[in-house]
Amino acid sequence: MSLGRVTVTAVRNLHPVTLNPSPRINILYGPNGSGKTSLLEAIHLLGLARSFRSQRLSPVIQHEQPACTVFGQVLWNDGRVRNLGVARNRLGELQIRIDGQNVRSAAQLAESLPLQLINPDSFRLLEGAPKVRRQFLDWGVFHVEQRFLPAWHRLQTALRQRNSWLRHGRIDPVSQAAWDRELCLASEEIDSYRRSYIQVLKPVFESVLHELVELDGLTLSYYRGWDRERSLGEVLAASLPRDQQLGHTQAGPQRADLRLRLAAHNAADLLSRGQQKLVVCALKIAQGHLVDRARRECIYLVDDLPSELDEQHRRALCRLLEELHCQVFITCVDLEALREGWRTDTPVALFHVEQGRITQTHDRE
């Protein structure tokens, strides 16, 4: 799967552009501030209907423009073609179109265009709050288990009902019991999908990590969000007074986490910044392998790689990306830092970016 064509209008400083990228490696090079990251942001907007640089979309829309738009043509390996379009205006209104039809759910975009982002903020996967790691985990489960999303929606509905009751106490005992039962059923289902996914992810992650860096003793484990020796129903009953005091549900899948440990310590506390970056890269590439096993592929957006890794590790990462046989968009300031990182038979397209203008220069010599 790859983006065969992408058209970007009014995204930050980018001039209107239509690109026909390589189905494999695409290198965007040019000075800092030229718009390289903005193109990655536009592709991210196309796949997830949101930016990875700003929680608000208004900064993404070009100055004095009413809206930004991104269109893309997704080419599947079996010959299918899917046309995607996303538009955001300054009022925050979102329009999503798939094959000419308006759709309401960004999940349909994510399903059509699986994206993995590796950028300087990727450290947050190790250092950040559990929510960041849950999002990483659920991205993977979503793309390999079709039953996950309906269960997740059921969980969110049940949680909202229970938390509302905890804050206001306006629910009869029969309804309360029914929502608790629904919460437990959805939670157990989600936990089973997550556990199954982690069991498959761990050996792939360990293998990929070994290709990047030697970190003996690094372990990846999954915490489901409540005591593994007790049912969620038991935990909810025991924690009810505290939940009422706080006004929200403390235990459940919404408290799940991935834990990376090294020598019995939080790995983020012991690893250097470079080692953390390599661990995150290994996690995200491992996820790509699992998506590939599900007979799909994801597209990698890699921002400013040369400034994050030395030449040895940069070449190792490029080799791992090549082995996935997926499409990659990767940015750099100095083209020479990435030009020679690929096999001679790998299609590589080069795009020069300067002052918001993107020009395809030539393929690798």
Curated annotation (Swiss-Prot):
Q: Indicate the principal place this protein occupies in or around the cell.
A: cytoplasm
PROSITE patterns hit by this protein? RECF_1, RECF_2
Q: Which domain of life is it from?
A: Bacteria
Residues that bind ATP, according to the entry? 30-37
Coiled-coil residues: none
Single GO MF annotation? single-stranded DNA binding
Gene Ontology BP, a term:
DNA synthesis involved in DNA repair
Which cysteine-cysteine pairs are annotated as disulfide bonds in the entry? none
List UniProt keywords, sorted A-Z: ATP-binding, Cytoplasm, DNA damage, DNA repair, DNA replication, DNA-binding, Nucleotide-binding, SOS response
Q: Which Pfam families match?
A: SMC_N
The subcellular location is: Cytoplasm
- Signal peptide boundaries: none
Q: Does the keyword DNA repair apply?
A: yes
List, alphabetically, the PANTHER family matched.
DNA REPLICATION AND REPAIR PROTEIN RECF
Q: Which family does it belong to?
A: Belongs to the RecF family.
Q: What is this protein called?
A: DNA replication and repair protein RecF
Source organism of the structure: Azotobacter vinelandii (strain DJ / ATCC BAA-1303)
Gene from which this protein is expressed: recF
